[in-house]
A protein has these predicted regions:
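Active-site and adjacent substrate-binding regions of carbohydrate-active enzymes
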Residues: 1-502, 508-509, 513-526
């Protein structure tokens, strides 16, 4: 599965912003890469205060990206290339520009229009204090006050009011939105903040002052609640009306809670973010892989591996930082000479071979296949992420992983489009452009293509990937495993070379010296 962040993938009309025309122009590239499907970040009508996750109309395409007719054509064109299309669904909140929220502001307290959201009276004299202590993921209170004195809930930016899933209109509307896109050929949905949706009755204080941005804490009264699962089962019934459709959950929950989202009548997949969040450490990687495979097997699902996405520092940069350095804080505070970019690139290539060898599904964020690093030097005056503003400039935000893709090594936008780019591309992107890598037999792009081709052949032959994983003892700092088709993956995560097991090298993430596997290097053996 290949993730497309529309604004930054390809610009078809030269206005500096990615669009559907640009996406259609790159379908041949995606087919050659070997992807089975693409997940499209929100392309709906939106003021783009949070990159499209503030949806004003779920049935209309943002006119900066194209039209609904173009979206339908993209889905059809992708199918002709053998590529299915998942669309992003944002059910926890709408944009403050959504017709429902506009109506709620024009309606009195206690009205049905306000009941579609979470409007409450405040505490303290004159209701001047927020209804409780809940915090926004982006920083500050999760409540904002409106002109008549009431407060509304927004777990994210104030422009993203949370909808009330206890109101029947909300469930009916999202059923209809799902059918709208399924009728137009969408293969399914990636569900945004799938661990949110419902809130504890009475809106009790959380009782803690915390904002980790991921919602992984236990007993938070607005995250990972058991009463959200009937909503998911209702969605699953909608999908089951159609042939061969799926949902994947973005649920930042503890590993022990993830299987609850993967029961046979709920999600088909849920992202395993534990590997994404793990340091470069063989013991931790082995434990995470074991736990994920075991949990997925218990509910008849499969593991869903991901190393980067549009919300986190790219792994080619994360892996180049010393252990214990928090990437999101390092972006702003540095010191930036801590980064070993070459080491990060080596580890990113090795991690690609590791995940593509594992049973389950693999999600690749656009640019991962080029080895793109985080654009960590973005000037502060170009930052667009609301996290930068809502955190009072204490967190730089996610713009660095959203910089437009370089397609060619030259030109004003490196082949992104005929004009400029909505975020500036760093100088090192030129050497990493897709066009520059096409002719380099040692490039990250060709490594991905070859690895995906081998993976597809293994799936086609029915060998290996569905079989149990067997760990191989190659050393404490090595992740090594094999499967039924005799392909073995060996990843040296230590600081010293290790001896390779016997076998023929099919793929290597870097140069191999005889029978020695260098640090930060992976191989596939037969």
């Amino acid at each position: 599965m290949y993730q497309i962040y529309v604004r930054s993938f390809a610009d078809g009309n030269g206005d500096g912003t990615g669009d559907i025309a640009g996406m259609r122009s790159r379908l041949g590239y995606l087919r050659q890469l070997g992807v089975d499907a693409v997940w499209i970040n929100p392309w709906y009508r939106s003021p783009l205060r949070d990159g499209g996750y503030d949806v004003a109309d779920y049935r209309e395409i943002n006119d900066r990206f194209g039209t609904t007719a173009e979206a339908e054509a993209f889905i059809d064109d992708a199918a002709e290339h053998g590529i299915r299309v998942l669309v992003d669904l944002v059910p926890n909140h709408t944009s403050s520009d959504h017709v429902w929220f506009v109506e709620s502001l024009a309606s009195p307290a206690g009205s049905d229009a306000r009941a579609r959201y979470h409007f409450l009276d405040g505490r303290g004299p004159g209701g001047a204090e927020a209804p409780n202590d809940w915090q926004s993921v982006f920083g500050g209170s999760a409540w904002s006050r409106v002109a008549d004195g009431q407060w509304y809930l927004h777990l994210f930016d104030e422009s993203q009011p949370d909808v009330n899933w206890d109101h029947p209109d909300v469930a009916d509307e999202f059923d209809a939105v799902m059918r709208f896109w399924l009728d137009r050929g969408a293969a399914g949905f990636r569900i945004d903040v799938a661990h949110a949706l419902t809130k504890a009755p009475g809106y009790p204080d959380a009782g803690l002052d915390v904002n980790d941005g991921k919602g992984t804490l236990d007993a938070v009264p607005y995250l990972d609640r058991d009463d959200l699962h009937p909503i998911v089962r209702r969605w699953r019934r909608v999908l089951d009306e159609y042939d061969d459709r799926m949902m994947v959950a973005e649920a930042w929950v503890a590993a022990g809670r993830r299987p609850l989202y993967l029961r046979p009548d709920e999600y088909h997949q849920a992202f395993d973010f534990d590997l994404l969040a793990a340091p470069w450490d063989a013991k931790q990687f082995r434990g995470i892989i074991d736990d994920s495979l075991r949990a997925a097997e218990a509910v008849g699902s499969n593991s869903t591996w991901v190393l980067s996405n549009h919300d986190v520092v790219r792994h080619a940069t994360r892996y180049g930082l010393p252990a214990g350095v928090e990437p999101a804080l390092w972006l702003l505070d540095g010191p930036h000479d801590l980064l070993d970019a070459e080491r990060g690139a080596r580890r990113a290539r090795a991690a690609a071979l590791l995940t593509l060898a594992l049973p389950g599904s693999v999600y690749v964020y656009q640019g991962d296949e080029l080895g793109l690093p985080e654009a960590w030097e973005l000037p502060l005056d170009v930052l667009d992420d609301p996290i930068w503003h809502d955190s009072d400039h204490s967190v730089k935000g996610r713009d660095g992983c959203r910089v437009p893709i370089p397609w060619e090594p030259t030109g004003p936008s490196l082949g992104f489009g005929k004009g400029g780019t909505w975020l500036p591309q760093p100088p090192e992107f030129a050497g990493l452009a897709a066009g520059a890598q096409e002719t380099d037999p040692n490039s990250t792009l060709l490594l991905y293509r070859h690895a995906i081709a081998v993976r597809r052949e293994r799936l086609r032959s029915g060998a290996g990937l569905d079989a149990g994983l067997v760990w191989l003892d190659v050393g404490a700092d090595v992740v090594a495993f094999g499967q039924a088709d005799s392909i073995r993956c060996v990843v040296n995560m230590g600081d010293e070379p290790v001896s390779l097991p016997d076998g023929v090298v099919l793929l290597a993430s870097g140069p191999i010296a005889g029978d020695q596997l260098p640090p930060d290097t992976a191989v596939w053996l037969r």
